[in-house]
Amino acid sequence: MIPAGRAHLHVAAVTHPGQRGKSNEDRFAVSAHRLSRSDPTPSLLAIVADGVGGHRAGEVAAEMAVETISRLVAESDAAQPVRILSQALARTSQLIFEQSHRDLAQVGMGTTAACAWIIGDRLYSATAGDSRLYLLRNGALQRLTTDHTWVQEALDHGVLSPEQARDHPNAHVIRRYLGSKHPLHADLRLRLRQGESDAQAEANQGMRLLPGDRLLLCSDGLTDLVEDAEILAALSADNGSEEALNGLVNLANARGGHDNITILTLEMPPKPIQSRLRLSRRRVLSCLVGGAILLAVLLLAAGVSWILLRDGGLLGSTSTPQAQPTSLAPTTGTPIIPAEASATPLPPASPTPSVPASATLATAT
């Protein structure tokens, strides 16, 4: 793919270390591309990673995750997005595991990862761990991903109730993460409806995003302390701007802020990009055609006028009649002066809105 200078979705992101005085082991990245020189379809990849491991090793794992996944996706042809994402997470997990055995201080390090890849208006995702992906559409907030934790498995099997799960001592035991000694199988399910089978959820890959849809990726430092309904209220009131995200961070910190907090939102433009481009091109073409026709008419009129003026066809002349014996003075004819041609200025051509060209916007905080 070809790096682009701007993303085709509006991006907002915040990250905070929390209130416990620990270093920030969360990382996020956003990178924008076009598919190829012959195919200008825009692509945007967003990643949130939450590192785990002592001696700052979690930072290393999370940093490796966002950098390696971003690079592997950027080097792809985007022909099979689900396979590319799955392989990128698996390869990154292997590299983190290998790195952890080169340095004793990094043994056991790992990281979660939540990835959202939007190609045009199609969404593809892959996750591992308990970092989440949400969809805000038509005033409703839908969690698209499933946590890979001991507690979530207990909930799925009816061993715990939601109330019991909230404060359970195993609440943060992660069952799937990048950096494990076992090969990673990324979770490719996109859950749009209650009761969907795993196969149905995976079939939602490539779902079409609608104008105004918003995606939210976050680490568990937010969702451990802030309810989904509160996230919805904040985004609905403030359109997912940095101010709304900072408000959610402040709310989590006010309730203890026991972990790093990272939130990233992606918002689809109000109208489909391709439709706006086609409309703009039609307008520009109409202006150009209309201007060309008007210019041709003016040039033709000017040419005809010049010929007539040159030949005297429209000009009257001052006549000097032959003197007659009985004339006291010559008679002067009144010249006919043609009216000046008025030129109508050409309408200015409307500029064609540029589709942002995009260099990598990857951010690691």
Predicted regions mapped to residue ranges:
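PP2C/PPM-type serine/threonine phosphatase catalytic domain
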Residues: 1-364
